[in-house]
């Protein structure tokens, strides 16, 4: 596990952003912070490394990335995503994950990855 300077910087950018961030936004912030222009494939390779090693998650529904605040503790979690402000919450529920795996097994299906994204509205946006 080699945590290169580029991987470290991209991880820091994602964690500090506090909201889901898209790859090209990461590229822009990386250039701004380091003063160096990276090419998109460099950013995507670092993102792939961070996902594969459990440091970040990809939110497919909004094509963005978020930090994992308990890396390597689990592989399956679900996300609550506000459709208005894009704030998210990472949640874990072992029973939910077990039920997904049981349901898949009954259908002769082997799950390799589970990311459940639930869209709705956060309390702050509801109150506005």
Predicted regions mapped to residue ranges:
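Alpha-solenoid HEAT/Armadillo repeat architecture
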Residues: 15-16, 31, 90
């Amino acid at each position: 596990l080699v945590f290169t300077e580029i991987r470290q910087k991209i991880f820091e950018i994602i964690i500090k952003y506090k909201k889901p961030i898209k790859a090209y936004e990461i590229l822009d912030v990386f250039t701004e912070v380091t003063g160096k222009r990276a090419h998109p494939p460099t950013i995507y390779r670092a993102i792939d490394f961070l996902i594969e090693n459990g440091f970040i998650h990809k939110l497919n529904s909004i094509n963005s990335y978020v930090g994992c605040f308990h890396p390597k503790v689990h592989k399956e979690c679900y996300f609550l995503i506000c459709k208005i402000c894009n704030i998210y919450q990472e949640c874990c529920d072992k029973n939910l994950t077990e039920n997904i795996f049981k349901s898949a097994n009954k259908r002769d299906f082997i799950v390799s990855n589970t990311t459940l994204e639930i869209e709705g509205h956060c309390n702050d946006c509801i109150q506005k």
